A protein has these predicted regions:
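Noncatalytic luminal/extracellular "stalk/propeptide" segments of secretory-pathway proteins
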Residues: 73-197, 299-302, 307-309, 313, ...
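Acidic/histidine-rich catalytic neighborhood of metal-dependent amide-processing enzymes
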Residues: 204-209, 213, 217, 234, ...
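Bacterial N-terminal signal peptides that target proteins for export
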Residues: 2-12
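Long, well-ordered, tryptophan-enriched scaffold segments
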Residues: 220-233, 237, 245-246, 251-320
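N-terminal hydrophobic or amphipathic helices/low-complexity stretches enriched
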Residues: 25-102, 123, 334
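C-terminal motif of bacterial Sec signal peptides marking the signal peptidase cleavage site
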Residues: 18-21
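Metal-dependent peptidase/peptidase-like ectodomains
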Residues: 135-140, 151-152, 177, 253-284, ...
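Extracellular/luminal Protease-associated
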Residues: 135-255, 259-263, 326, 334, ...
Length: 415
């Protein structure tokens, strides 16, 4: 088990989160501010400060240790550790006086999954007019099927660099420029434009910067594959995280009629540089050209074929855990104050230098679950329940693409 640590600094922000669920008597939360510049007013109920004292570092550390214990095997979706985690959360909420919050009167909202294990080729070959390049699985690239089918075959597809792969009308940004990329493999930068605070959200990542958006945008454009260029600054994590997160069984929601690329992949920036040079181009120059609204897709002068098999595991599931504390005011009890964190992690994967193959996920996200449960304990210590109902929503399969959050927002049927 990888070591974990707790810090008392976590406690103080939690006091604000507890206060967010409390309004003083006589305040229905609907009063108008005195002007557009007036900050929102937050007032603690009389006993909120005392109730908050149940939140302490020792309690947080204990809950994190339990959730990150080897016995939960990394909390991978649709595993025994996943079920044990959900049981732990439900029991903790019940001890705090919360009631089951799912529509059927249980603690759990099912999240249907399809498991996909892609068996990628050891070498992926690319050809230019005059040369050939092979990228090694694991060291240079990580790939997966983009479709819920047992076989994928792509034949002699052209590679096209599409900058960030973003179409955002509200930002006057379109990397595709209506260029026909049907049947092609698209190569794109990670994240979204972040060098200018007036572009997108500056350094804050929007959905446009997420890997799932990029694969979706490529599919809508008719591409057969999409490759994201990884850099540690743009991703916020090293390529090792890609290696451990995007290998083994991957989970998705059951496919609908939405367009999908047949191949999703990541490459290191070093491998991307070799791909660019194979076609007589320079990666740094391509990246620089993408830093403009005037960017247009660029052929890499490279083509590739790839074929692989996948194991498709249909009919599996995980679940969101929902606990609700009914509000005390009949006129406001139908309104919800929601606290949320995801309860899943990466499960069991490649063995590290110490022989450990369990990805315990203390920070990601046992700490978040412990935070929500600590707030629940504080609510249970209040002498009078909040006027609005409080929902503790512990979502599943975040690591697989926000699947639990999507399931809840598609069907927010709590209480």
């Amino acid at each position: 088990m990888r070591s974990i640590r707790s810090r008392s600094r976590w406690v103080f922000p939690l006091l604000f989160l507890l206060a967010a669920g409390c309004t003083p008597p006589g305040d229905d939360g609907s009063s108008e501010s005195s002007g557009p510049s007036s900050p929102p007013q937050l007032t603690l109920t009389a006993d909120a400060d005392e109730a908050a004292q149940v939140i302490d570092a020792a309690t947080l550390e204990s809950m994190i240790a339990s959730l990150a214990d080897d016995s939960l095997a990394g909390r991978g979706p649709a595993t025994e550790g996943d079920q044990l985690t959900r049981t732990y959360i439900a029991e903790a909420l019940a001890e705090c006086g919360f009631e089951p919050g799912a529509a059927d009167g249980s603690w759990e909202q099912p999240v249907e999954l399809v498991g996909l294990t892609s068996h990628m080729p050891k070498e992926w070959t690319f050809n230019s007019e005059n040369d050939t390049l092979s990228l090694d699985f694991w060291d240079d690239y990580i790939g997966n099927t983009g479709v819920q089918e047992p076989s994928v075959s792509i034949d002699d597809a052209e590679l096209v660099f599409v900058g960030y792969g973003i179409t955002a009308p509200e930002e006057d940004w379109n990397d595709y420029k209506d260029v026909d990329v049907r049947g092609k493999i698209l190569v794109m930068l990670n994240n979204d434009p972040d060098w200018d605070p007036d572009l997108f959200a500056g350094s804050r990542r929007l959905y446009y910067g997420r890997w799932d958006y990029k694969y979706e945008s490529a599919a809508k454009a008719g591409a057969v594959g999409a490759i994201i260029i990884h850099t540690t600054p743009s991703a916020g994590y090293p390529f090792q995280v890609v290696q451990t997160s995007w290998t083994g069984e991957q989970f998705e929601a059951p496919a609908g009629n939405e367009p999908r690329v047949r191949l999703t992949a990541w490459v290191t920036d070093e491998a991307a540089g070799r791909l660019a040079r194979l076609g007589g181009l320079d990666l740094d120059e391509l990246i620089a050209s993408a830093h403009s609204r005037d960017f247009r897709p660029v052929s890499l002068n490279v083509r590739s074929s790839i074929a692989f098999e996948s194991t498709v595991n249909e009919g599996t599931h995980t679940a969101n855990v929902l606990g609700i504390l009914p509000g005390s005011d009949p006129e406001l009890a139908d309104e919800l104050v929601v606290y949320t964190a995801h309860h899943d992690h990466l499960g069991i994967g490649a063995t590290d230098a110490d022989g450990d193959s369990i990805y315990n996920g203390a920070r990601d996200n046992a700490s978040g679950v412990a935070t929500v449960l600590a707030i629940a304990r504080a609510f249970s210590a209040l002498e009078e329940r909040p006027r609005r109902s409080v929902l503790m929503l512990l979502v599943a399969a975040e690591e697989q693409g926000l699947l639990g959050s999507e399931a809840y927002t598609n069907d927010p049927t709590a209480h």
